[in-house]
Amino acid sequence: MPALLELDHVGLSYHTLSGEIQALSQISFSVQEGEFVSLVGPSGCGKSTVLNLIAGLLIPEQGQITMQGLPREHSVLSVGYMLQKDHLFEWLTIYENVLLGLEIQKRKTKESLSHVDRLLQEYGLWNFRFSHPSQLSGGMRQRAALIRTLALEPALLLLDEPFSALDYQTRLSVSDDIWKILRKEGKTALLVTHDISEAISMSDRVIILSKALTCRPVRVPIPHHLRRPRTTPMPDAKLPPNSSNNF
């Protein structure tokens, strides 16, 4: 059976007034259905560009992106995209925010509304559904943004550093919550992060993207029950680890 997602020697350049800038070159990797894969690398190495290509926001100049064996542009599989900021509309309630994608795509049905209600109830936002985003904590806002994405039932979920705007301790807690939600919902996910510890704790595999525009897949051999939860207090957990020397 073909991989849910496959990138085959994908390349892209940006054309600027000062010349051509190579953003990605010969990038190849795959993601199987049900996997949680992290794409790790320093700022400016093209991690977000990879997600934009997969989402169809950019078109590769070289290579091909396929989903279950079909070219990305011909695939009927839906892709959800969760960005760094939650992008909740402050003048809408949480319930109105999470229904927004369904309304735009004209997919608001009895079944989809029931699905949204279940997500809100199971993940602690049901009692806040008529609140506005400004009344919620950063972690609750991210949960609302995730539910808005899951409401569309995507086959693949792209996560572009969704915890980067949170403080370190909140980031640990929210990443635990989101990992549990995605596992319970059986979703396939590709996470972009520059935090190696975050990638290892959440992923089945880690793909390292370097400034040399190359990628290298690494399987995480540590069982999940030994990696989680990351929110357990540790004497040396006051500051985030410095992973800048790993690239």
Feature roles, as predicted:
Residues 132-136, 140:
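Conserved ABC ATPase signature
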Residues 55:
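Helix-to-loop junction immediately C-terminal to a conserved catalytic motif
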Residues 92-99:
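Short coil-to-helix segment of the ABC ATPase nucleotide-binding domain corresponding to the Q-loop/switch region
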